[in-house]
């Protein structure tokens, strides 16, 4: 088992939810967390515990973003006008690796991060290899010509159901995606409920 698959399984098991909607998620087979003490019955979480869990779930969904980087995203969200929770989701969905994942150019958020890191993606015609790069409205993201025949890409596109979110305009033949607008929370296709308001409460303690 690769480290990325192991990490995904751990996150699902710890959360007790299939946060990416994968058919092979371990929570489809059992309801307890990872480790030797995973089968113990969980007590009711405190308010802090509920907030922490919401933060860990959101961090995990976007590929286990490090705490320092995730907190920096929250700080930026809190400085923007409007609802901080909505701003947080908007900033996370503007990450280049998230856009590549949403466009279904690769199968997972973990693969998207590696794909960007290895220089397979261009934004407005220029190569960008920073997964956290903030895509702007109107930007065009594309897979580099030399990378379009990679097995990872071909398999992902072949399996894609084309149900990309409305805020992206995707051409799977050309492997391009235009970021049309910053999404609202209810537009983001999360397989499970995300609660950015609890994340805001966690950091506002």
Swiss-Prot record:
Pfam families: Ribosomal_S4 (PF00163), S4 (PF01479). The keyword Transcription does not apply. Residues 19-45 are annotated as: Disordered. GO terms for molecular function: rRNA binding; structural constituent of ribosome. GO terms for biological process: ribosomal small subunit biogenesis; translation. The keyword Transmembrane does not apply. It comes from the Bacteria. GO terms for cellular component: small ribosomal subunit. InterPro entries: Ribosomal_uS4, Ribosomal_uS4_bac-type, Ribosomal_uS4_CS, Ribosomal_uS4_N, S4_RNA-bd, S4_RNA-bd_sf. Residues 94-157 form the S4 RNA-binding domain. Keywords: Ribonucleoprotein, Ribosomal protein, RNA-binding, rRNA-binding. Part of the 30S ribosomal subunit. Contacts protein S5. The interaction surface between S4 and S5 is involved in control of translational fidelity. One of the primary rRNA binding proteins, it binds directly to 16S rRNA where it nucleates assembly of the body of the 30S subunit. Belongs to the universal ribosomal protein uS4 family. This is Small ribosomal subunit protein uS4. It comes from Azorhizobium caulinodans (strain ATCC 43989 / DSM 5975 / JCM 20966 / LMG 6465 / NBRC 14845 / NCIMB 13405 / ORS 571). The gene is rpsD.
């Amino acid at each position: 088992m690769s480290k990325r698959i192991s990490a995904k399984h751990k996150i699902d098991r710890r959360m007790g939810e299939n946060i990416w909607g994968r058919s092979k998620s371990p929570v489809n087979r059992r309801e307890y967390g990872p480790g030797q003490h995973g089968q113990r019955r969980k007590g009711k979480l405190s308010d802090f515990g509920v907030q922490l869990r919401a933060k860990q779930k959101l961090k995990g969904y976007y590929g286990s973003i490090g705490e320092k980087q995730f907190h920096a995203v929250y700080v930026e969200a809190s400085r923007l006008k409007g609802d901080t929770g909505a701003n947080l989701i908007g900033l996370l969905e503007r990450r280049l690796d998230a856009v590549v994942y949403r466009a279904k150019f690769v199968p997972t958020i973990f693969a998207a991060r590696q794909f960007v890191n290895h220089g397979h993606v261009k934004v407005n015609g220029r190569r960008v290899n920073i997964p956290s790069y903030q895509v702007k409205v109107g930007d065009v993201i594309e897979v580099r010509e030399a990378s379009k025949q990679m097995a990872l890409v071909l398999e992902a596109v072949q399996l894609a159901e084309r149900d990309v979110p409305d805020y992206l305009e995707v051409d799977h033949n050309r492997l391009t995606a235009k970021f049309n607008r910053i999404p609202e929370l209810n537009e983001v296709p999360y397989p499970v409920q995300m609660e950015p308001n609890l994340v805001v409460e966690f950091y506002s303690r």
